[in-house]
Amino acid sequence: MDNLRMYGDPPFRVLVAHGGPGAAGGVAPLARELGKKRGVLEPYQTKKTVSGQIEELRETIEKYCSPQVILLGHSWGAWLVYLFAAKYSDLVDRIILISSGPFEQHYASGIMNIRLNRLGAEEKARVEELMSLLSNAELKDREALSEFRKLMAMTDHFDLLEDAERVEVNIDAEIYKSVWTEASEMRRSGELLKTGKKIRCPVLAVHGDFDPHPAEGVEIPLSRILKDFKFRLLERCGHMPWMERHAREEFYRIVEAELDKG
């Protein structure tokens, strides 16, 4: 399967979902590290709808995994595994939400302002130009999305390891545009949070204190609707905890402890 990376040895009971949407390969260092102790899958999301990506994940789990599985999701991937756990609770042991976007719209309104305020005038102008391009319904420009992600990386991270620059991410602008448009509307309408009431498994959210996505936008809404929910805030940490110089060790300690419970 071209859209699947495997780490460690079977049985595969841990799966790591990447962000973006459409940023395949972004969690490879995380999946590889976790795979040193267990079988881990890193699937690439290829479908252009939220439901399509959920079903694609189900097919991967049913074909390659030994349910029940532990699902980790980063950024958009956190929403994906959350939605998956709500629909297919019988397949899931627990989920770990890493650097999730906020679950209610009012928490999301200030994210871009935080990012822009961390940039210089030239970079800020370029981000605004790229945002206009990314809103184009005909967009198929991987280079524009890649440049946008690099500029966001300047604002989203606290102190990244040098290795972060060498992570190969396969950008798909069409997936980003299509899936994010649908997912953000789910948040705006309240459907995203409401769906989580169907989750029956334990949920752990891990978040960096420097991440422009506000931690309270994850902790507060999920605390209201989930029966078994824990939240851990990492200090001096941005949007990619496993690549953060100061938070990496604590991040892996938290995640490994949670995986050992599964």
Where are these regions (language model features)?
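Conserved HGGG/HGGXW glycine-rich cap/lid loop of the alpha/beta-hydrolase fold
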Residues: 2-50
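Active-site loop/oxyanion-hole signature of alpha/beta-hydrolase fold enzymes
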Residues: 41-76, 87, 251
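Conserved hydrolase catalytic core segment
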Residues: 68-111
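Flexible "cap/lid" loop of the alpha/beta hydrolase fold
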Residues: 96-133
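Alpha/beta-hydrolase
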Residues: 128-194, 201
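Short beta-strand/loop motif that positions the catalytic acidic residue
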Residues: 199, 205-207
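Conserved alpha/beta-hydrolase "acid-adjacent" motif
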Residues: 212-218
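Catalytic histidine-centered segment of alpha/beta-hydrolase-like enzymes
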Residues: 237-248
